[in-house]
A protein has these predicted regions:
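Topology signature of small-to-medium multi-pass alpha-helical membrane proteins
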Residues: 1-136
Length: 136
């Protein structure tokens, strides 16, 4: 394919990428809400405030990755994939413990993980791969 023509092909963002960005953002928002409720029940005072600050920093990093993915930065989707591949097996025992102590908490955690998996699958579809490979 001619490099001069390549940028015009598939220049608009594929629906799969748009949906992936939406699903990933939803997973972070759902996870943040769950975390705030957990922290509110377990902590108070300075420990609660400090935990909320760390949560906000974590969310900022997550949304930075999502915005970079939406901006067609291939490195962002690869880094996010690597983090998911590393994190998901490590989090699985926690999901089991959460399900035993609270079905609601465990279910929400699993829903967050499923949303992230769906988002990653959408980011690596054929149309998504082509979109990330084309030059801006």
């Amino acid at each position: 394919m001619d490099p001069a023509i390549e940028p015009t092909i598939n220049a608009s963002r594929p629906l799969a990428v748009t949906r992936a960005v939406q699903v990933l953002a939803a997973s972070f928002i759902l996870g943040a809400i769950r975390t705030v409720f957990d922290l509110a029940h377990k902590l108070s005072g300075a420990a609660f405030v400090l935990s909320i600050i760390f949560l906000l920093i974590f969310l900022a990093v997550c949304f930075f990755f999502v915005s970079m993915i939406a901006a067609r930065r291939n490195w962002a989707r690869i880094v996010f994939l690597v983090l998911l591949i590393i994190g998901l097996p490590l989090a699985t025992p926690t999901y089991i413990v959460e399900l035993k102590t609270s079905v609601l908490r465990g279910s929400v955690s699993i829903a967050v993980a499923i949303l992230q998996l769906i988002g990653m699958v959408l980011l690596f579809t054929k149309n998504s791969n082509q979109w990330f490979r084309t030059r801006k």
